[in-house]
Amino acid sequence: MTVRVAINGFGRIGRNVVRALYESGRRAEITVVAINELADAAGMAHLLKYDTSHGRFAWEVRQERDQLCVGDDAIRVLHERSLQSLPWRELGVDVVLDCTGVYGSREHGEAHIAAGAKKVLFSHPGSNDLDATVVYGVNQDQLRAEHRIVSNASCTTNCIIPVIKLLDDAYGIESGTVTTIHSAMHDQQVIDAYHPDLRRTRAASQSIIPVDTKLAAGITRFFPQFNDRFEAIAVRVPTINVTAIDLSVTVKKPVKANEVNLLLQKAAQGAFHGIVDYTELPLVSVDFNHDPHSAIVDGTQTRVSGAHLIKTLVWCDNEWGFANRMLDTTLAMATVAFR
C-alpha cells in the first residue's frame, strides 16, 4: 500500500523530507497529501525549488491556489494554527510528520490523532511518555502496531547512537563524552540581537558559539546503563550545514585504532549499510553535504590512548541524513501498523 502522509511544518526538515522522497524514488511507497505551514504558499514553493545547501530541486515546482504542485503531484496547502482544526480525517492521513520543531509532547500527538491521523512522527526528541523513540537502523524493529505517537529523535542522536552501539557491543563501554560541532541554526542571529541565551545574541557567522545540548539524555534513553556515565557539550560553527561529532569512550577490552576502524568499516558494509558509512579520504565538512547516511565515520581521525580510550570523529548531514531517516521510520511505522 501507499502511505498517505501529511507534513506539519515546512521548514528545513519538512522541505528536505519532500525533496528526499522524490530523489530517493519512494513515491510509490509514500505520497504527501498535505502540508500545513503558516508561511505563504508562494514562499513555500520558492524555498522547495531553490535551496542554499542542497541546490536546485530537479522537479518542477509551482503553486496553484491552495496547492503545491511537484511534477504531476498536487499537494494541498494548509495554514492552520490549531492542530485540532487540521483536516487529517478528511484527507485520509496515515502518518503525520510533525516537522515544526515546536511540538513534541503526547498531548500534541493526541491532537493530531483527534484530527484524524492514524500515526504521528515527530522530527525531534519528544517527551518521555511517547510510545517510542526510534533511531532507524538500531531499534526500529521494536515498533509495534499500537505505537501511534513516535519520535525520530534528533539528527545528532541518529548520528552517534549506531557508533556507540557498535563500540559497546564489541568492547564494552564504561563511560564517554561527546562534543557536537554543529552548523549554525535558525535560532541564532545574523547580526548581534537579543536572545534569552546570551551566547546566541551574537552573530552566527562570526563566532564558534557554545550552546546547551540534551544529547547525553538522548544517549541514555537508548542505553539506560550509561546513566551518569555520558556527558555532552555542543558548539555551533559558522557553516550552514553538516555536523561533526567528537566521540570519546573508555572501554573494558583493550583495543587498537586499526581494530576500531576495521569494526566500523565492516559495519558500514554489512549490518549498518545505508545508515553508517566509513571513509579514509581527506575530506572536509562540505564534502558530506547531501549525504543520506546517518553517520559517516572518518577513519583518519580514530585514536586510541592507553588501549582503553577510543576517540572517533563522525560526520553527518544534519538535514539530509535525518530527512531520509524520517522516511525510513515512516515506512517502518506503516509496515507494522497496516500489514
Swiss-Prot record:
<dbReference type="GO" id="GO:0005737">
    <property type="term" value="C:cytoplasm"/>
</dbReference>
<dbReference type="Pfam" id="PF02800">
    <property type="entry name" value="Gp_dh_C"/>
</dbReference>
<keyword id="KW-0963">Cytoplasm</keyword>
<dbReference type="Pfam" id="PF00044">
    <property type="entry name" value="Gp_dh_N"/>
</dbReference>
<feature type="binding site">
    <location>
        <position position="200"/>
    </location>
    <ligand>
        <name>substrate</name>
    </ligand>
</feature>
<dbReference type="InterPro" id="IPR036291">
    <property type="entry name" value="NAD(P)-bd_dom_sf"/>
</dbReference>
<keyword id="KW-0560">Oxidoreductase</keyword>
<keyword id="KW-0520">NAD</keyword>
<feature type="site" description="Activates thiol group during catalysis">
    <location>
        <position position="182"/>
    </location>
</feature>
<dbReference type="GO" id="GO:0008615">
    <property type="term" value="P:pyridoxine biosynthetic process"/>
</dbReference>
<protein>
    <recommendedName>
        <fullName>D-erythrose-4-phosphate dehydrogenase</fullName>
        <ecNumber>1.2.1.72</ecNumber>
    </recommendedName>
</protein>
<comment type="function">
    <text>Catalyzes the NAD-dependent conversion of D-erythrose 4-phosphate to 4-phosphoerythronate.</text>
</comment>
<dbReference type="GO" id="GO:0042823">
    <property type="term" value="P:pyridoxal phosphate biosynthetic process"/>
</dbReference>
<dbReference type="InterPro" id="IPR020829">
    <property type="entry name" value="GlycerAld_3-P_DH_cat"/>
</dbReference>
<feature type="binding site">
    <location>
        <position position="236"/>
    </location>
    <ligand>
        <name>substrate</name>
    </ligand>
</feature>
<dbReference type="InterPro" id="IPR020828">
    <property type="entry name" value="GlycerAld_3-P_DH_NAD(P)-bd"/>
</dbReference>
<feature type="binding site">
    <location>
        <begin position="213"/>
        <end position="214"/>
    </location>
    <ligand>
        <name>substrate</name>
    </ligand>
</feature>
<dbReference type="GO" id="GO:0048001">
    <property type="term" value="F:erythrose-4-phosphate dehydrogenase activity"/>
</dbReference>
<feature type="binding site">
    <location>
        <position position="81"/>
    </location>
    <ligand>
        <name>NAD(+)</name>
    </ligand>
</feature>
<feature type="binding site">
    <location>
        <position position="318"/>
    </location>
    <ligand>
        <name>NAD(+)</name>
    </ligand>
</feature>
<feature type="binding site">
    <location>
        <begin position="12"/>
        <end position="13"/>
    </location>
    <ligand>
        <name>NAD(+)</name>
    </ligand>
</feature>
<feature type="binding site">
    <location>
        <begin position="154"/>
        <end position="156"/>
    </location>
    <ligand>
        <name>substrate</name>
    </ligand>
</feature>
<dbReference type="GO" id="GO:0051287">
    <property type="term" value="F:NAD binding"/>
</dbReference>
<dbReference type="InterPro" id="IPR006422">
    <property type="entry name" value="E4P_DH_bac"/>
</dbReference>
<keyword id="KW-0664">Pyridoxine biosynthesis</keyword>
<comment type="subunit">
    <text>Homotetramer.</text>
</comment>
<dbReference type="InterPro" id="IPR020830">
    <property type="entry name" value="GlycerAld_3-P_DH_AS"/>
</dbReference>
<feature type="active site" description="Nucleophile">
    <location>
        <position position="155"/>
    </location>
</feature>
<comment type="pathway">
    <text>Cofactor biosynthesis; pyridoxine 5'-phosphate biosynthesis; pyridoxine 5'-phosphate from D-erythrose 4-phosphate: step 1/5.</text>
</comment>
<comment type="similarity">
    <text>Belongs to the glyceraldehyde-3-phosphate dehydrogenase family. Epd subfamily.</text>
</comment>
<dbReference type="InterPro" id="IPR020831">
    <property type="entry name" value="GlycerAld/Erythrose_P_DH"/>
</dbReference>
